[in-house]
Regions:
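Helical element adjacent to the flavin cofactor pocket in flavoenzyme catalytic cores
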Residues: 149-207, 218, 370, 379
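Active-site lid/adjacent beta-loop-alpha segment flanking the redox-cofactor pocket in flavoenzymes
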Residues: 226-235, 247-337
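Dinucleotide-binding Rossmann-like beta1-alpha1 core, especially the glycine-rich loop
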Residues: 59-135, 145, 264-265
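Central helical "cap/lid" subdomain
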Residues: 50, 199-251, 295, 382
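Flavin (FAD/FMN) cofactor-binding core of flavoprotein oxidoreductases
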Residues: 134-137, 232-238, 300-366, 371-374, ...
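N-terminal Rossmann-like FAD-binding beta1-loop-alpha1 element of flavoenzymes
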Residues: 15-42
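Glycine-rich FAD pyrophosphate-binding loop
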Residues: 35-56
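Short beta-strand to alpha-helix junction loop
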Residues: 68-79, 103-112, 149-168, 296-301, ...
């Protein structure tokens, strides 16, 4: 079934576990399930894996600073960071640890640094520390700020490399990926799950794991027999701009104090040293079809970008930014609301022994992917055997 869509003329294919969604989280979940000896098939709507939310990110390995104590984001990010860096080392995937600065540009923002410092220490980020403006200037002379948090554990990673390694692991364990297989409906009951795809195929399994990202809400609502909770869906588009004709201006990743809906327009670099800034937050209609979203960069947002960046980098040259790419984050909290936790619902939440739903897997989803895989296997218990 690998690399082809399921066709109508094929019989209904039965497996232990179907994973809907071939992003980095879906592949990590499928790999974790396959490692338990279960048969796993990933159903991916696109022509290749990891091309939607996964490929339109900042490619950052987060330390675990921003998230409330005990939240899934806190627990899975800290655990996932350790798993991911070890996984990259074992599989030859490139990554490195430049560290991150979260910069308070004035005294009014320093209280927020204290809150983040407490969160980080509570969550187990032991190397996180606050620095004053003098040390900040020593580390990054061109960054303007009165204080900052220094996170040595924050890194960057070749996300495409991780996606490729996860897929190879899955297939080596006997799993498969069915591309061009968009789930449009199905049914779930005590005997298992059957799903239908837009391409005319069907598949059945003992357990379904819904990792469809932006489309997870649609998949859940399309399943006859499922009457469990589905959280609200909010979509936050984030534009990125690259620094034209110049390499990274800083040695560290540089973030502002977080803003409503995101972490603020921050500076990151890729492993080749190319610099980019983003994402901003552009709220979209939460009822938009996941297949019809506009990923073009909104160039009219450039002046706001420049203004945000110059708060911590006054030396940004005029005309230095060029459109790079845009991503869309699946969220369960909207404008003006506190950032929501990951929603990973198993039988204890919705009462369906054959289904696990994942909603709102935004940042730090990439960092957390392997830990999410572990967590989902724990929720499944013995149901997929």
């Amino acid at each position: 079934m690998t690399d082809r869509a399921m066709r109508r003329e094929s019989p209904v294919e039965r497996t232990d576990c179907l994973v809907v969604g071939g992003g980095i989280v879906g592949l990590a979940v499928a790999r974790a399930v396959a490692a338990t000896g279960r048969e796993v098939v990933v159903l991916e709507a696109a022509d290749s894996v990891g091309t939607q939310t996964t490929s339109r990110s900042s490619e950052v390995i987060h330390a675990g600073i921003y998230y409330p104590e005990g939240s899934l984001k806190a627990r899975l990010c800290v655990r996932g960071r350790k798993l991911l860096t070890r996984y990259c080392d074992e599989h030859g995937v490139s990554w490195r640890r430049p560290g991150k600065l979260i910069v308070a540009v004035d005294d009014a923002q320093t209280g927020r640094l204290d809150v983040l410092l407490r969160h980080g220490h509570t969550n187990g980020v032991g190397d996180l520390r606050r620095i004053d403006g003098v040390e900040l200037h020593e580390l990054e002379p061109d960054v303007q700020g009165v204080a900052a948090l220094l996170s040595p554990s924050t890194g960057i990673v070749d996300v495409d490399g991780v996606v490729g390694a996860l897929r190879r692991d899955l297939e080596s364990a006997g799993g498969a990926v069915a591309l061009r297989s968009r789930v449009i409906g199905g049914r779930v009951d005590n005997g298992g799950v059957i799903v239908d795809t837009a391409e005319g195929g069907s598949a059945s399994a003992r357990v379904l794991v819904n990792c469809a990202g932006l489309g997870a809400w649609d998949v859940a609502r399309s399943l006859d027999g499922f009457d469990g909770p589905v959280p609200p869906r909010h979509l936050a588009k984030g534009n990125y701009f690259g620094l034209s004709g110049a390499r990274a201006p800083f040695q560290h990743l540089v973030y502002p104090v977080p803003v409503d809906g995101g972490l603020g327009v921050h500076f990151t670099m890729d492993l080749a040293g190319a610099a980019r800034f983003g994402p901003d937050v552009e709220w979209l209609d939460g009822d938009s079809d996941a297949g019809d979203l506009d990923y073009s960069v909104d160039e009219t947002r450039l002046p706001d970008f420049e203004g945000s960046i110059r708060r911590y980098w006054p030396g940004l040259p005029s005309g230095a930014l060029a459109p790079a790419y845009a991503g869309i984050r699946p969220k369960t909290s909207g404008p003006g609301e506190a950032a929501a936790d990951f929603v990973i619902d198993g039988p204890a939440t919705h009462g369906h022994a054959r289904l696990v739903n994942l909603f709102g897997i935004e940042s730090p989803g990439i960092t957390s992917c392997l830990a999410i895989g572990e967590y989902v296997v724990g929720l499944m218990g013995g149901e997929a055997r």
